[in-house]
From Swiss-Prot:
The keyword Cell cycle does not apply. Induction: Expressed in the early phase of the viral replicative cycle. Belongs to the orthopoxvirus OPG056 family. GO terms for cellular component: host cell; host cell endosome; membrane; virion membrane. This is Protein OPG056. GO terms for biological process: microtubule-dependent intracellular transport of viral material towards cell periphery. Interacts with protein OPG164. Interacts with protein OPG064. It holds the Pfam family Pox_F12L. Plays a role in intracellular enveloped virus (IEV) transport to the cell surface through microtubule transport. Together with protein OPG064, forms a complex that interacts with host KLC2 (kinesin light chain isoform 2) to engage the kinesin-1 complex and thereby promote IEV trafficking.
Length: 635
């Protein structure tokens, strides 16, 4: 089994081999090392990310294990309460989702009945979901003629003498609860089909839920510490035995991983006496250090670990940064060299426990020397980038592309006086994220050639992006940028699917789409009904000139870093759902998808195998490579 995986890794440069490798990753986690000896844990959820960061054919496969884990994500965002919008029809009134729909009904009826309006103004009414309490209030104000009557009771002839009574249709709706509809006209009323929606767009559009990105960039921190976790191979999988820090201590324990971690956490707590947040800086820590510690994380230790964040029970926070994501693919020694510190080797990971014990004294010293070099390089790089990308600071970002693009967008925004905003509320963020589709759309299975957009940067830098806070609109305005909750109906004829949906048996579904994706889908024959949208009246102009200026500035500082950064920006948009430029990523991905579809339109559909926002698989038998395809690169 191990030999088979080792061979697959050495030849994992084509789609078929990678798919076979994925099958093994459903059962095992691959233990690998790079040329510098740094451990890397490869599992089914992170292999794509690893392949985007490095050439996996150059990794050394050490073993397979089931005794490991993935990064522990932050607690999931609670599901938002499903939403029904208000419907005021000539035959009925259905209030929007509310804890007190009966109160909404009586307030709506007061628009027609002045005596109800006067009583509400004089006396007010307490919130209640009880019909008997509503009727008691009406009776006490001399308004018993408007008493609330359930539709079923009215039909039993029990209340026919009350000609002015408020007849309500009572129901229970899943994930919402009790709901009532005021029946205005019994002769024409039929219970309506009401869309139960995943988002309340009006609520999401509230001004206080949106913050200008520039106001979130000027942050300070007190302390930075370089850190590295070393792991040895045991019968039960990889085991951490040493945690080194600089400046700081080295912790070693071959007998109890729990004690190793607790000693490290006690030391962290001691140095946080004067600050609530510190920064730990590792190298490839997201690929080895953090997931390895997560496996052994002690219960009831006073700290929780979520991805790269440690949070203590008293609210102290440790951000564990991965400097590799700011290196543009450089090895640790090259990174240190390029940022002016002396490159030093580090102890190898994933060695036998007995070898680690035998060499521990020399490896403690070697680890400290390597960490000192990493610390100095990181401090130099962060200082330089914070000048060039002011006011962005490295510790506020998870990778260099995000920092670079944020600085460009902020600069353009400030120069034009039109800032980009981002959502601060979990539900608002989830709505925006829901419009982002990174999945492959499968058309058919056939032997195919893979093509990728030649320059993502060229496509996205010439487009427009939202500026200012959004407004709520029922339907988006043509020519403006907006994100809408949509009811989508797929075409009845043969078609290339454009809007991703994971249920092939459903022809109508509700999803979130950008105005760019709506235009693309409509062109492809989809029927789309907009159920509410966030719309922006202003746009940030083209980013191209500012992008080029920023690239030149970084190039003058460090040509190797800039070339690698530029290559990453050209090849990919690494979407980051925690980014403050979430809106930029949303529309950038839509623009790329629209470009891919414009190419699909020029090709006979029988040759299309699958596609994503940046890649297109075309049948190997297709020979008519047209001029449009010149903007794609064959992989």
């Amino acid at each position: 089994m191990l030999n088979r995986v080792q061979i697959l890794m050495k030849t994992a440069n084509n789609y078929e081999t990678i798919e076979i490798l994925r099958n093994y990753l459903r059962l095992y986690i691959i233990l690998a090392r790079n040329e510098e000896g740094h451990g890397i844990l490869i599992y089914d959820d992170n292999i794509d990310s690893i392949m985007s960061m490095m050439n996996i054919t150059r990794l050394e496969v050490i073993g397979l294990t089931t005794h490991c884990t993935k990064l522990r994500s932050s607690p999931p965002i609670p599901m938002s309460r499903l939403f029904m919008d208000e419907i005021d029809h000539e035959s009925y009134y259905s209030p929007k989702t509310s804890d007190y729909p009966l109160i909404d009904i009586i307030r709506n009826r007061s628009h027609e009945q002045g005596d109800i309006a006067l009583a509400l103004e004089r006396y007010g009414i307490d919130n209640t979901d009880s019909i008997s309490e509503i009727n008691e209030w009406l009776s006490s104000k001399g308004l018993a003629c408007y008493r609330f009557v359930k539709f079923n009771d009215y039909r039993k002839q029990m209340y026919r003498k009350f000609s002015k009574c408020t007849i309500v249709d009572s129901m229970i709706i899943g994930h919402i609860g009790h709901h009532y509809i005021w029946i205005k006209n019994l002769e024409t009323y039929t219970r309506p089909e009401i869309d139960v929606l995943p988002f309340d767009i009006k609520y999401i559009s509230r001004d206080e839920l949106w913050v200008r990105i520039s106001s979130s960039l000027d942050q300070t921190h007190i302390k930075t510490i370089a850190v590295s976790v070393y792991g040895a191979i045991t019968d039960n999988g990889p085991m951490p035995y040493m945690i080194s820090t600089y400046p700081g201590n080295t912790f070693v324990n071959f007998n109890s991983v729990k004690d190793l971690i607790l000693n490290f956490l006690d030391w962290i707590k001691d140095i946080m006496t004067s600050t609530r947040t510190i920064i730990l800086v590792g190298y490839m820590s997201n690929l080895f250090d953090i997931p390895l510690l997560t496996v052994y994380w002690p219960n009831n230790c006073g700290w929780k670990i979520y991805n790269n964040i440690l949070i203590s029970s008293d609210g102290a926070r440790v951000i564990w940064m991965d400097a590799y994501k700011f290196s543009c693919g450089l090895s640790l020694q090259d990174y240190c060299y390029h940022w002016g510190s002396k490159p030093e080797s580090r102890p190898f990971d994933l060695i036998k426990k007995s070898d680690a014990k035998r060499n521990i004294k020399s490896w403690v010293k070697e680890s400290m020397t390597s960490l000192k070099s990493l610390y100095e390089a990181f401090e130099t790089q962060s200082g330089a980038l914070e000048v060039l990308m002011s006011p962005c600071r490295m510790f506020s970002f998870s990778r260099i592309e995000d920092m670079f693009l944020t600085s460009v967008i902020n600069r353009v925004s400030e120069n034009t006086g039109m800032g980009m905003y981002y959502p601060t509320n979990d539900i608002s963020s989830l709505f925006i994220e829901s419009s982002i589709c990174l999945d492959y759309i499968i058309v058919n299975n056939q032997e195919s050639n893979k093509y990728r957009i030649k320059s993502v940067l060229d496509i996205i830098s010439s487009k427009q992006y939202p500026a200012g806070r959004p407004n709520y609109v029922k339907n988006g305005t043509k020519g403006k940028l907006y994100i809408a909750l949509c009811k989508v109906t797929v075409p009845t004829n043969d078609h290339i699917p454009v809007v991703y949906h994971d249920d092939d048996n459903t022809t109508t579904f509700i999803t979130v789409l950008t105005s760019v994706d709506i235009e693309t889908a409509t062109r492809a024959g989809y029927s789309i009904v907009e159920l509410g949208a966030l719309q922006w009246d202003d746009n940030i102009p083209e980013l191209k000139d500012c992008l080029l200026d920023s690239i030149k500035m970084i190039y003058d500082l460090n040509a190797a870093t800039t070339n690698n950064l530029l290559e990453q920006l050209i090849e990919n948009i690494n979407f980051n759902n925690s980014s403050i430029i979430l809106l930029f990523y949303t529309f950038a991905i839509s623009y790329c998808r629209a470009f891919i579809y414009s190419i699909i339109e020029t090709i006979d559909p029988v040759y299309i195998s699958q596609f994503s926002y940046k890649e297109l698989y075309i049948s190997s038998s297709y020979k008519d490579i047209n001029e449009v395809m010149s903007q794609m690169v064959k992989l």
